[in-house]
């Protein structure tokens, strides 16, 4: 390999270095920038046009004397060293250690941009992943190989929820090791310390690889971090045959860094100033999750997206929703009521849930119980709105039962302790406890066999379940 070195920097702006008279510079090529003091900085080519090359410098362009700055083109993509020893380590966006331990020394290196996967070679996501969180496991189940984002807002406990998922996630009845890759972008020192202490104190750090980008780090590094983390995840999943859960927070910080760099490049802005290629850039990250035929490992992804002004139509959550397979939406109203995790059930959805639950996965009644809970809670919210207008005393007896169900559902099912790890069996049993609060005619989405086996009838646990004319009839939207 013949390296080329040039001293033709013409301008530096926002972490970008503009080079001229560079024949043959390649997109994605790794470069080394050396300043007049001999200090080296890492960079990557992000644009080429004729003999003009644009280099993003990960450590920033501050204090660069352009006339005395050398740029060496290495004619190779940006790669990171990888080995099974990455577990338990903490790195930054370029793969440098952040844990006061030596750099990784490994003969194996992998391109941070990953290898293209033939869509035909992809396997359909299946198999239930237990997070220990009832609102997710019971109603919005996570499936191995799925992309399921968390839509949050400023001040909501998405960091605590992400840490809890990393601590508690597991595959049921699976002997293959289940490991996590945790990527944090634009977080504060206190948040970074929180994550590190959470994983250390709970004893899971040994099966977690952490990639941290702090709020005061150059935004250029933020753009590389999710790709670096996913390169590690692909190595663990498809070369070490491990099941990998990738949790990334916060993709909004990533998108804002992308907007900042795009503005410095002079790209034409689109919605709210974000570049027109925001969708394809996010897809390039999200679509690296999944399963591959004839490979035992898998990558499951849970990205956290904080919605500016709680606006779910904002470009970042909006485009994320088009790419991923559902969403977990957090509610500010539930948060103010002291409910953790404040999962807003009606707008939350897991599109692949049906492929990971039921007989031989969780329990045979799971799909029907989840449907019944959704229907009952939707009806209960209608009754709650009606009660706010006419008063609870004017409600019919059955509507009062639904009103009581709404409060009990939020306080007992959605709400749980931050250290509470509920099994899927505990979650489903709790669901049946709550359904016993409802009138019998409302239980139309479960079968007679389900009622006979699991339902707890008030007053007489031995009483036979009543016959139902249409066990699958949907509840009318209006009483």
Curated annotation (Swiss-Prot):
Q: Name one GO biological process term.
A: proton motive force-driven plasma membrane ATP synthesis
Q: Which SUPFAM superfamilies match?
A: C-terminal domain of alpha and beta subunits of F1 ATP synthase, P-loop containing nucleoside triphosphate hydrolases
Instruction: Give the residue ranges for region: Disordered.
Output: 458-479
The UniProt keyword set, sorted, is: ATP synthesis, Hydrogen ion transport, Ion transport, Transport
InterPro entries with a match to the protein in the record: ATP-synt_VA_C (IPR055190), ATPase_a/bsu_AS (IPR020003), ATPase_F1/V1/A1_a/bsu_N (IPR004100), ATPase_F1/V1/A1_a/bsu_nucl-bd (IPR000194), P-loop_NTPase (IPR027417), V-ATPase_su_B/beta (IPR022879)
PROSITE patterns annotated for this entry?
ATPASE_ALPHA_BETA
A single Pfam family it belongs to is: ATP-synt_VA_C
Q: Which GO terms describe its molecular function?
A: ATP binding; proton-transporting ATP synthase activity, rotational mechanism
The membrane-spanning stretches of this chain are: none
Summarizing the function annotation, the protein's role is: Produces ATP from ADP in the presence of a proton gradient across the membrane. The V-type beta chain is a regulatory subunit.
PANTHER family, sorted: V-TYPE PROTON ATPASE SUBUNIT B
Family of this protein? Belongs to the ATPase alpha/beta chains family.
Name listed for the protein in its UniProt record: V-type ATP synthase beta chain
Q: Which organism is it from?
A: Nitrosococcus oceani (strain ATCC 19707 / BCRC 17464 / JCM 30415 / NCIMB 11848 / C-107)
Q: Read off the lineage from the record.
A: Bacteria, Pseudomonadati, Pseudomonadota, Gammaproteobacteria, Chromatiales
């Amino acid at each position: 390999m013949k390296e080329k070195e040039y001293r033709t920097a013409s301008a530096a702006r926002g972490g970008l270095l503009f080079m001229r008279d560079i024949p043959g510079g390649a997109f994605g090529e790794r470069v080394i920038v050396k300043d007049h003091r001999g200090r080296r900085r890492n960079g990557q080519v992000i644009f080429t046009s004729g003999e003009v090359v644009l280099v993003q410098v990960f450590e920033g362009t501050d204090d660069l004397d352009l006339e005395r700055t050398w740029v060496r083109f290495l004619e190779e993509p940006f790669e990171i060293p990888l080995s099974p020893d990455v577990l338990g380590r903490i790195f930054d966006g370029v793969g440098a250690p952040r844990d006061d331990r030596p750099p990784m020394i490994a003969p194996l290196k992998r391109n941070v941009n990953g290898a293209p996967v033939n869509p035909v070679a992809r396997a359909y996501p299946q198999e239930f992943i237990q997070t220990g969180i009832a609102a997710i496991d019971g109603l919005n189940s996570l499936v191995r190989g799925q992309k399921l984002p968390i839509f949050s807002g400023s001040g909501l406990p998405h960091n605590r929820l992400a840490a809890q998922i990393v601590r508690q996630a597991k595959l049921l009845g699976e002997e293959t090791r289940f490991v996590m890759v945790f990527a944090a972008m634009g977080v504060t020192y206190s948040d970074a310390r929180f994550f590190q202490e959470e994983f250390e104190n709970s004893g899971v750090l040994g099966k977690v690889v952490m990639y941290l980008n702090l709020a005061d780090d150059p935004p250029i590094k933020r753009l590389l971090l999710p790709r670096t983390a996913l390169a590690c995840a692909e190595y663990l999943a498809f070369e070490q045959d491990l099941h990998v859960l990738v949790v990334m927070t916060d993709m909004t910080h990533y998108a804002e860094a992308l907007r900042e760099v795009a503005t410095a490049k002079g790209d034409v802005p689109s919605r709210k100033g974000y570049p027109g290629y925001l969708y394809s850039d996010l897809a390039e990250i999200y679509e690296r999750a999944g399963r591959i035929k004839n490979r035992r490992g898998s990558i499951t992804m849970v990205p956290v997206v904080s919605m500016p002004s709680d606006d779910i139509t904002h470009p970042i959550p909006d485009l994320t929703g088009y790419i991923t397979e559902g969403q977990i939406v957090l509610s500010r109203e539930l948060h103010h009521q002291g409910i953790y995790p404040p999962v807003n059930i009606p707008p939350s959805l897991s599109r692949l849930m049906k492929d990971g639950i039921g007989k031989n996965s969780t329990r045979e009644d799971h799909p029907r119980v989840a449907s019944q809970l959704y229907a009952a809670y939707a009806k209960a919210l209608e009754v709650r709105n009606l009660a706010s207008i006419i008063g609870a005393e004017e409600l019919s007896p059955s509507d009062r039962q639904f009103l009581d169900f709404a409060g009990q559902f939020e306080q007992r099912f959605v709400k749980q302790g931050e250290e509470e790890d509920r099994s899927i069996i505990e979650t489903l049993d709790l669901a049946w406890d709550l359904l016993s609060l409802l009138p019998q005619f409302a239980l139309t989405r479960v079968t007679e066999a389900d009622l006979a086996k699991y339902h707890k009838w008030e007053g007489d646990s031995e009483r036979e379940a009543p016959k139902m004319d249409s066990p699958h009839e949907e509840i009318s939207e209006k009483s």
